[in-house]
Amino acid sequence: MKWLVGIFAVFLLCLMIYAGSAFVSALGLVSAVRSGDAAQVMTRTDLPRVRHSIIDQVMAAYLDRLGQKRPVRPFERMAINAFGATIADDLAIKLMTPENLSVLLKTGTVRNAAENITLGTMSSLADLDISNIFVFVGRIKLIKPVEFALRLGESQDAGSVSMHLDGTSWKLSGIGLPPKVLTNMVDRLPTR
């Protein structure tokens, strides 16, 4: 019986360390965003994963848009996935510069500063109330044991961020854009 209690206590301790490390990393990211320190935001970001998450969302929204007007044939779907990812990757690279990423997380404005284009807004990470732990925990959705999503607000247009366990710390690994922002991004892509 003592072994069972000991094993359970060790399990609870490991679970608390796991959850605590996620909370501390999220708190560090929010602090870096609030201070406007782009260098700190970038050190707490897995940029290739964030770009990939943007590309996946843009490609899915693009295929949905094409499917609304007419059925997308399998060959078209394959071509869009092959060549469209290049176009979406170019868009994601422009959106995920250190300056644009810092502005997105701090103000919620999705923009391309190089072309002076604003694509929409979402809730900002800087406005997230981390002082109320119960609200914070209520917004977490576990995706995998090493990744979670954090909703930035209550509405669908609020958006979300994902954090991934990278070694011993958690890093920003994705940004869930609201449907309106994705629609604005897809409208800038060619239809053929």
Language-model segments: residues:
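Alpha-helical transmembrane signal-anchor/signal-peptide segments
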Residues: S25-Q40
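Short extracytoplasmic
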Residues: A38-Q68
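Alpha-helical transmembrane segments of polytopic integral membrane proteins
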Residues: I17, F23-A26, L47
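Alpha-helical transmembrane segments and their juxtamembrane interface "caps"
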Residues: T43, R139-I140
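Soluble, non-membrane globular domain cores that form compact, hydrophobic packing
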Residues: F8, L27, P190-R192
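Structured, soluble extracytoplasmic/luminal domains of envelope-associated proteins
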Residues: P74-N132, F136
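Short beta-strand edge/turn micro-motifs at domain boundaries
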Residues: T109-N112, I117-A126, V135, P145-T191
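Hydrophobic membrane-insertion alpha-helices, especially the h-region
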Residues: K2-S21
